[in-house]
Curated annotation (Swiss-Prot):
Record function comment: One of the primary rRNA binding proteins, this protein initially binds near the 5'-end of the 23S rRNA. It is important during the early stages of 50S assembly. It makes multiple contacts with different domains of the 23S rRNA in the assembled 50S subunit and ribosome.
GO terms under biological process: translation
Statement: the UniProt record of this protein carries the keyword Transferase: no
Pfam families tied to this protein: Ribosomal_L4 (PF00573)
Compositional bias of kind Basic residues: 58-70
Signal peptide: none
Disulfide cross-links: none
Origin species: Polynucleobacter necessarius subsp. necessarius (strain STIR1)
Protein name (record): Large ribosomal subunit protein uL4
Length: 206
């Protein structure tokens, strides 16, 4: 499998050989969907909470007598039927949203995503990606020169300059191969991978 090399001026150069086992697999849409949804679900923190009828502030006094008023019987104002009453099935921070995806499925999903990106021309290789200074302006100008807007950059080792320069750019993310996730791969318009990172990705996903 040959991946195009993207130069600093935005022109595609000679191809770089990559393993077909990782970058030339059939696209499995159902598997990719499952892996991405599971990744999002496992990232949920469970930060919503509602009160049931035991937790709302209320009096236990009976609102009116049981019989003789013509009104529906009522026991206390915390009833879920009443305004200000508790919820019947309240949301809780202890809810578990996690979804199980085994390693074999996860790796297959990642291979499927990378292969599809390569077919669509959204995945390119770069020689190396270093900055002389931790300046966001320098990185933004480099992205503009390469014709990139929304991009995920995967490098063998993230330098301090590159990390500091990229963290204030909304549509630019820089990660190492072991931290590349399925959501980021499908979320960004373009994926740039350094030559050294290609080797690491192949080792991780074989």
């Amino acid at each position: 499998m040959e991946l195009k090399l993207l130069q600093d001026n935005g022109i595609l150069g000679a191809g770089v050989q990559a393993s077909p086992e990782v970058f030339e697999r059939e696209y499995n849409e159902a598997l990719v969907h499952q892996v991405v949804v599971a990744y999002q679900a496992n990232a949920r923190s469970g930060n919503r909470a509602q009160k049931d009828r035991e937790q709302v502030k209320h009096t236990t006094k009976k609102p009116w007598r049981q019989k003789g008023t013509g009104r529906a019987r009522a026991g206390m104002s915390s009833s879920p039927l009443w305004r200000g009453g508790g919820r019947i099935f309240p949301n809780s921070p202890e809810e578990n949203f996690s979804q199980k995806v085994n390693k074999k499925m996860y790796r297959a999903g990642m291979r499927s995503i990378l292969s599809q990106l390569a077919r669509e021309g959204r995945l390119n290789v770069i020689d190396q990606f270093n900055l002389d200074a931790p300046k966001t302006k320098v990185l933004a100008e480099k992205m503009k020169a390469m014709g990139l807007d929304s991009v995920l950059i995967i490098v063998d080792q993230v330098s301090e300059n590159l990390y500091l320069a990229s963290r204030n750019l909304h549509k630019v993310a820089v990660v190492e191969p072991q931290h590349a996730d399925p959501l980021a791969l499908v979320q960004y318009k373009k994926v740039l991978v350094s030559k050294a990172a290609i080797t690491k990705i192949e080792e991780l996903l074989k």
